[in-house]
Curated annotation (Swiss-Prot):
Database matches in HAMAP family: Ribosomal_uL22_B
Keyword Transmembrane: no
GO molecular function: rRNA binding; structural constituent of ribosome
Record-given protein name: Large ribosomal subunit protein uL22
Function per UniProt: This protein binds specifically to 23S rRNA; its binding is stimulated by other ribosomal proteins, e.g. L4, L17, and L20. It is important during the early stages of 50S assembly. It makes multiple contacts with different domains of the 23S rRNA in the assembled 50S subunit and ribosome. The globular domain of the protein is located near the polypeptide exit tunnel on the outside of the subunit, while an extended beta-hairpin is found that lines the wall of the exit tunnel in the center of the 70S ribosome.
Lineage: Bacteria, Pseudomonadati, Pseudomonadota, Gammaproteobacteria, Alteromonadales
């Protein structure tokens, strides 16, 4: 049984979120939560929320035992980018790109 959870339009760049996602792929959920809890990265907080949601979905919807769950898949896709303007000297302007991510976590009991 596979259960998934998503966080769409997360306000972090996919490159930074993938660094965190790669650390927990394939681990038991207890070990993954331990790593995410003590990680100093902002993306770790976002990924931890998705992992917690996936665990809750497995518990509530499928009646799964938490001790048997592991992270089957975790991937971070690129969301839409927000374009902003930063005023500069002499009437010029620079474009600022604020990236978003779609974080998906799949837990399974196998």
């Amino acid at each position: 049984m596979e259960v998934l959870a998503k966080h769409r339009f997360a306000r972090t760049s996919p490159q930074k979120a993938r660094l965190v996602a790669d650390q927990i792929r394939g681990l038991p959920v207890a070990k993954a939560l331990e790593i995410l809890t003590f990680s100093p990265k902002k993306a770790a907080v976002l990924v931890k929320k998705v992992v917690d949601s996936a665990i809750a979905n497995a518990e509530h919807n499928e009646g799964a035992d938490i001790d048997d769950l592991k992270i089957a898949k975790v991937f971070v896709d690129e969301g839409p980018t927000m374009k902003r303007i930063m005023p500069r000297a002499k009437g010029r302007a620079d474009r600022i790109i604020k990236r978003t991510s779609h974080i998906t976590v799949v837990v399974s009991d196998r």
